[in-house]
Amino acid sequence: NPIIDKYIPINKSYKIYLSANTDIYQTGKLLLKHFDVRIFRRMIRDLYTRSTSIDETLKIWQKVRLGENLYIDPFKDDANYHINSFHAYELCIYKKILKSFESDSKELNKLKNSLKDFEELSAEVAPKDSVLQEFLPKN
């Protein structure tokens, strides 16, 4: 962010961009975009750490994306290093967590349906020091 950069000498900073940046394909067909993976993360984190319902998170998601487009995306190419934080097994965990949530939300049902061919996994398979822990329910 240039506002912060002007106060830190370039030789004293190292910029890291961390995000789930993997699109998911099934038999050559796009199943989920990387931002769909991120909405799964956001729905579950908000539910368990912010007491925000899944439906409420879905309602504000477009505003969240707008904020990213305005305040994060323009600067991601300035990062010295990019880390793709996607874990191949995380969708299996989300399937298990979300299966008990019923909703009239077409968006939630579409997202849940996109996981139909995935196996279910317990959140306990995620290592305790994984960045994924930020998005999982705490026991």
Question: What residues fall within each predicted segment?
Answer:
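Conserved NTP phosphate-binding and transfer environment spanning the P-loop NTPase/kinase superfamily
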Residues: P2-N139
